Each structure stands twice: as structure tokens, then as C-alpha cells.
Amino acid sequence: MENCSSDAVVLHHFDYGEADRIVTLFSLEKGLIKGIARQARKSRKRFGAALEPFSTVHMRWQSRSGRDLVTLQDAELIDLRSGLRHNLLAMALAAYGCELVENLVGETGAQPPVYDLLTAFLTHVNHHGGSEEARLLLELRLLCLSGYAPHLVHCCKCGASFTSETVAFAASLGGSLCLDCVTGVDVQYLSLLSLGSLARALKAPLALFEGFRFGSQTLQQGGQVVSSMLRQQLTRPVKSLSFLSQLTEGSARVAAIR
């Protein structure tokens, strides 16, 4: 038996049996953790509000060799991020971000840069609400931290610099293509301006989400390119994406009417 503790983000939970709760966390010290909080629904003394999704906590647990679930002992709440529960779009985006981290990173052990990115993302959305910029930045940065950084500034086949205003992108090759190299490859097209915006975003600090203002074309084209890369790497669908897409489309229609 091993006693462990770490700061962690609560990704999600579900009730188990009459009083227990199964909790999935992404921790600073151990990465992805799944544990059982016994009697969590009957007694709030050990956990209180610390098992709420999107919260940052300091969690203590016991693990045993050969068992998938650790036993959660108690937790200290660091940041509840209560603002997310008053904004449906922000909450949906937070849920998507947490699920994306779980699916893309998986059980690969400690990944401090991913932990820092996730906490910065959740804090930003908690204070500023959901936005397409925040989603695009999270997706792009997660791809990079997971080893799938898109090749943007030169043709990924011939290495040439881009001279035309339109650039092709092949998710299957993981990067951009000049127009001379698109034969026989399934591609998407985006403007050189959009490509440059994505490249500049990758140079910014991982935890920085404020101050980004992408044009509508960059959001659309960049979002399509990043989504195609995510589909290449994810082994299962992101369930929360459907609800987030419904909310995002609804918000866009309302904005168009105003």
C-alpha cells in the first residue's frame, strides 16, 4: 500500500452504490487518477465541495498494486471555480476541456505542463466565460504537449516556404502543404493569414489565454484544421463535444440576429 498526495483537478465523477463516489482527477504529481471516495455522499466532512468537477484540490489517497481504483482519503479545496456553474457555455467548455485532457493524454503519468495548461484554461473560463479563442488555444496546445504539434510554417513534404495566399493542410501528414504537394492527399484549405495566427499562438506562454483576438476566418479555418488533427489522434469520441457544439452554434445564431 502506498500513501500519496498531490494537487489535482477534478475532471468528473459519478455516484457508486448507496453512498460512494467514483472520481477521475488529473494530478500534478501522478497524472490521471481514478479513485473511490467511500461514504462521500453521506458525510461531507472529509471532502465537502472538493469533489465538484473543475475544482482544484489537494488530494490524499492510498493505492495498492494491481488495483485500478485508488482509495481517496480526504481533500482540501484550493479553487472551486464556482463561476462556471453560473454560465452554461463556460461549464460546457470546461467539461470539454477536461474530457479532452483525459482522452488525449490518458494514463501516461505525471505531465506538469498539461496540468498547468488545464488549470490556466479552467481559471480563464471561470473568470471570462467560454470563447472560441480559449477552445482553439487549448486544443492547439494540447496537441503540441501530446507530441502532435502541427507543422505550420513550411510545407511538411518539400520544406518550401509558402508564397500563395492559400495553403493546404493534411491532418494525416500532420502539417501544411504547398499547392504543388497536394496531389493524392486529403486536404483542407486555409489562408496564409490564418496559418500565421496559429503559428504565433504556439509561441505564446502555455498558460496565457487573455489578449487573443482571432478573426472569424482564423477561428473557422483554424478550428477545422485542429479538429481534424484531434480526430486523427483520439481513440474515442469526446462525448461533451456534441452539447458544446449545440451551445456554440446557438450563440452564433443569436449574435448574427443582434
Swiss-Prot record:
Instruction: Give the matching Pfam families.
Output: RecO_C, RecO_N
Q: Which cysteines are joined by disulfide bonds?
A: none
Q: Which UniProt keywords apply?
A: DNA damage, DNA recombination, DNA repair
Q: Which gene encodes it?
A: recO
Keyword Transport recorded:
no
Gene Ontology biological-process annotations: DNA recombination; double-strand break repair
**What InterPro entries does the database record attribute to this sequence?**
ARFGAP/RecO, DNA_rep/recomb_RecO_N, NA-bd_OB-fold, RecO, RecO_C
Function of the protein: Involved in DNA repair and RecF pathway recombination.
Which GO cellular component terms are attached?
Answer: bacterial nucleoid
Recorded family membership: Belongs to the RecO family.
Supply the PANTHER family for this chain.
DNA REPAIR PROTEIN RECO
Protein name per Swiss-Prot or TrEMBL: DNA repair protein RecO
The domain of life is: Bacteria
